[in-house]
From Swiss-Prot:
Recorded GO CC terms: chloroplast; chloroplast stroma; chloroplast thylakoid lumen; chloroplast thylakoid membrane; extrinsic component of membrane; photosystem II oxygen evolving complex; thylakoid; thylakoid lumen
UniProt cross-references to Gene3D superfamilies, sorted A to Z: Mog1/PsbP, alpha/beta/alpha sandwich
NCBIfam families named among the record's database cross-references: PSII_PsbP
Keywords: Chloroplast, Plastid, Thylakoid, Transit peptide
Gene source species: Arabidopsis thaliana
Location of the protein in the cell: Plastid, Chloroplast thylakoid lumen
Family: Belongs to the PsbP family.
GO molecular function: calcium ion binding
UniProt keyword Transport present: no
BP GO annotations: photosystem I assembly
Role of this protein: Photosystem I assembly factor that assists the proper folding and integration of PsaB and PsaA into the thylakoid membrane.
Description of the deletion phenotype: Seedling lethal.
Protein name stated in the entry: PsbP domain-containing protein 1, chloroplastic
Highest taxon of source: Eukaryota
Length: 287
């Protein structure tokens, strides 16, 4: 979907392997061992003859000897079962303690390639595509609804870009991107204020030999808790949201391409490495 240069979409879309089977199997096995353990010790054990003095003691009968032998065997088997149960339970505790680490695997990325319009990028595997969102392509996190990614490009009929340098330096482009963001997020509600800052602007030559600009912006939205109050002290501004916006721009096919990522500031701090990988993967291709 084509649009004019820097005509970013004027929308904001706000926005687990189970271990139950493992636990139930392990606990079931543990219960089975405990049951066997109690069954072994619940068997009746015949007692031997009462203690007698050395003079009056009589030779033990074969029956008494067999009873003592059975008791010793039962105790030995019981001890082995007890040791096995202890080892099993300790292993279960250790394995359960390591479950978060085992399932905290490296995020998997998919690659989106648009050979018709000439661009590609990687995105988290669990993100879903949203159609009809206004951009050429739009993905969002299914859990964190404020976290999304979109791509737009200018129409070749209304623009003729040969290089990013036609737009100026990264700093100049950053100011234009910031103004575009503020225009999009302008609110007509009373008592609403947007506070925006450019965090960084940079340029890089990627492995495809092409130049890319990157702009990072932080925007906070404040709203009064009582916007109709007469006295200023009754209108207390509260933070509605705090988001990080990243944009990467490239030029190819006489078009200006841009990929934009929006995420809550708190989420960005937790997922910064993965989100930067997404932005660094953006490429424009000759068509």
């Amino acid at each position: 979907m084509a649009s004019s240069a820097f005509a970013f979409p004027s929308y904001i879309i706000t926005k687990g392997a189970s271990t139950d089977s493992f636990k139930s199997t392990s606990l079931s096995s543990s219960r089975s061992l405990v049951t066997d353990f109690h069954l072994l010790f619940s068997r009746p054990i015949s007692s031997g003859p009462k203690y007698q003095s050395a003079k009056s003691a009589k030779p033990e009968s074969p029956v008494a000897i067999n009873c003592l032998t059975d008791a010793k065997q039962v105790c030995a088997v019981g001890r082995r079962k007890s040791m096995m149960m202890g080892l099993l339970m300790s292993g279960l505790i250790v394995s359960q303690a390591n479950l978060p680490t085992a399932f905290a695997s490296t995020p998997v990325f998919r690659e989106y390639i648009d050979t018709f319009d000439g661009y590609s990028f990687k995105y988290p595997q669990n993100w879903i595509q949203v159609r009809g969102a206004g951009a050429d392509i739009f993905f969002r996190d299914p859990v964190v609804l404020d976290e999304n990614l979109s791509v737009e490009f200018s129409s070749p009929s209304s623009s003729n870009y040969t290089s990013l340098e036609d737009l100026g330096s990264p700093e100049e482009v950053g100011k234009r991107v910031l103004r575009q963001y503020l225009t999009e997020f302008m609110s007509t509600r009373l008592g609403v204020k947007r506070q925006a800052n450019i965090l960084s602007t940079s340029s890089r030559v990627a492995d495809d030999g092409k130049l890319y600009y990157q702009v990072e912006v932080n925007i906070k939205s404040y709203a009064n808790n009582n916007e109709l109050a007469v006295m200023p002290q009754d209108r207390v501004a509260r933070l509605e949201w705090n988001r990080r916006y990243l944009a990467v721009l490239g030029v190819e096919n006489d078009r200006l391409y841009s990929i934009r990522l929006q995420t809550p500031e708190k989420v960005f701090l937790e997922e910064e490495k993965d989100l930067r990988r997404v932005m660094d993967s953006f490429r424009v291709e000759k068509i």
